[in-house]
Every structure is written in structure tokens, then in C-alpha cells.
């Protein structure tokens, strides 16, 4: 059986768009199960929206596909959700791959807190295009030109993004999580980020490297948070994921020595 891979996107591009290059380059090496974020199911986020809604939805998707255990891939906000899933349901994962998690679940370090409190302050009171422009600008390294917004009026789906991203930020802040849970992971982790993203991405990579027992961190050159998906899921990146998936499958099939 091929590796079964569940993919969770971030707060901007839907899963089909975000992971199209990954799926195309992987070819027949794996079966992919795309899961869009629950926060966008309705025109506006539910008042009680929480990280638990997203985590439980991954369970429902996996159960509906008959996946007892699987590989999980997350990007940005989907990276936070994937990390939360990995910490609370480690027995279901064979491997975890994340590109630039929006943040790491759990109590923030001083460096993290300074960045996120600054981000929230800059976004406060903004709506629509102003919200999105500020959100994008804050995710890249100083001096890096962020991509321009799409031409024309936003589609109905994209109009959901500013309130949806704001709801995700609130949910991430409210989510209670102990980072020590990561130490229980018995699966490999591949964490990637771009050298043109805000330096806090390197901070998060370093934090995760302190907790996960088996983690590989890769910094990609010439890449930031908002480059086109094909610049993130390059042949090099996809080959690394396929190698990890197959190695993890073999390890998972071996009898436990514990």
C-alpha cells in the first residue's frame, strides 16, 4: 500500500492550490487526502471556533478514508494545526512534514511573544485588503518585496480570508498545549522554512528541534512564506518527503522493541 498522506493548507490558499505541485511531483509515490480548513466552511467563522474543531476534523477525514495511521503535511496555519494533532494524537501519525508553521502550539518564548504581539497590534482594526497586505508584509524578511495582491476584486472565497485568518490567530492564542508532548513522538518530522521569510521562522524551527526526538530541519534559499507553491514544493523538497514517508513506513512495520 502506498503512503497515505493528509494535507492541511494555511489560511490563504485552499488545499488543492497549495499542494498541487507536491501531488504532481510525487506522482504515484503516495495517495493524497486534501483537507481544507474548517474555519472557511461558512461565510463567517463560527463564534466558538477553536483549534479543536480543526484537529477533530482531521480525525473525521482519516476515519472516513479508513486511515488508522497516516502521514500528515501542514503549511502555515495548517502547520500549527498539524503540530497540535501530532502532540495530542501521536499514535495516529507515521510522519509529520511542516512548512513554516504559523506558530508553535504552547507557551511562547520571549522572542515568539514579541513577534506575535507586534503582529496582532499591526492587524488590529484592519479589514479586507488592508488586513491582507499588512499580514503578508509582516511574514517576510525586511527588504523583501512581498507579492502584489491579485488583480481585480476578491472572489467570495477570498473575502473569507481576513476574518478567517483573524479567527485562526485568536484560536492559536487561546489553545492550551504543553510542548513537552512533542517528546513522545515516535515518528520522523521534516520541518522546512525559507531564508527570505521573517527571522521568527528560524526561531520556531529551533524550538521544535529541541523537542522532537527525530527531526530534520531544512532552510530553502530564495523562498519566503508567500512564494508560489511550486517554489516551495520543488523536486528536492518532494524527494525528501517521499524518502521520509517510505522510511517511516518501513519503521512503522517493524515490531516494537519496547
Which residues does each PLM region occupy?
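Catalytic histidine-centered segment of alpha/beta-hydrolase-like enzymes
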Residues: 219-235
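Flexible "cap/lid" loop of the alpha/beta hydrolase fold
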Residues: 87, 94-124
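Short beta-strand/loop motif that positions the catalytic acidic residue
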Residues: 185, 191-193
Amino acid at each position: 500500500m502506498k503512503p497515505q498522506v493528509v494535507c492541511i493548507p494555511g489560511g490563504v490558499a485552499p488545499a488543492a492550490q497549495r499542494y498541487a505541485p507536491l501531488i504532481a511531483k510525487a506522482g504515484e509515490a503516495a495517495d493524497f487526502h486534501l483537507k481544507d480548513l474548517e474555519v472557511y466552511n461558512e461565510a463567517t467563522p463560527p463564534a466558538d471556533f477553536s483549534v479543536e474543531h480543526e484537529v477533530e476534523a482531521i480525525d473525521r477525514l482519516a476515519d472516513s478514508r479508513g486511515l488508522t495511521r497516516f502521514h500528515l503535511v501542514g503549511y502555515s496555519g495548517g502547520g500549527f494545526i498539524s503540530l497540535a494533532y501530532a502532540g495530542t494524537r501521536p499514535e495516529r501519525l507515521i510522519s509529520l512534514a511542516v512548512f513554516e508553521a504559523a506558530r508553535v502550539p504552547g507557551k511562547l518564548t520571549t522572542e515568539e511573544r514579541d513577534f506575535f504581539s507586534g503582529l496582532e497590534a499591526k492587524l488590529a482594526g484592519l479589514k479586507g485588503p488592508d488586513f491582507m497586505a499588512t499580514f503578508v508584509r509582516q511574514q517576510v524578511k525586511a527588504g523583501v518585496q512581498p507579492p502584489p495582491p491579485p488583480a481585480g476584486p476578491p472572489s467570495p472565497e477570498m473575502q473569507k480570508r481576513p476574518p478567517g485568518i483573524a479567527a485562526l490567530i485568536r484560536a492559536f492564542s487561546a489553545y492550551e498545549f504543553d510542548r513537552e508532548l512533542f517528546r513522545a513522538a515516535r515518528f520522523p518530522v521534516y520541518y522546512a522554512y525559507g531564508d527570505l521569510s521573517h527571522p521568527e521562522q528560524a526561531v520556531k524551527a529551533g524550538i521544535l528541534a529541541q523537542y522532537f526526538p527525530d527531526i530534520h530541519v531544512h532552510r530553502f534559499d530564495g523562498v519566503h512564506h508567500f512564494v508560489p507553491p511550486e517554489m516551495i514544493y520543488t523536486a528536492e523538497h518532494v524527494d525528501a518527503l517521499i524518502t521520509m514517508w517510505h522510511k517511516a513506513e518501513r519503521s512503522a512495520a517493524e515490531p516494537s522493541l519496547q
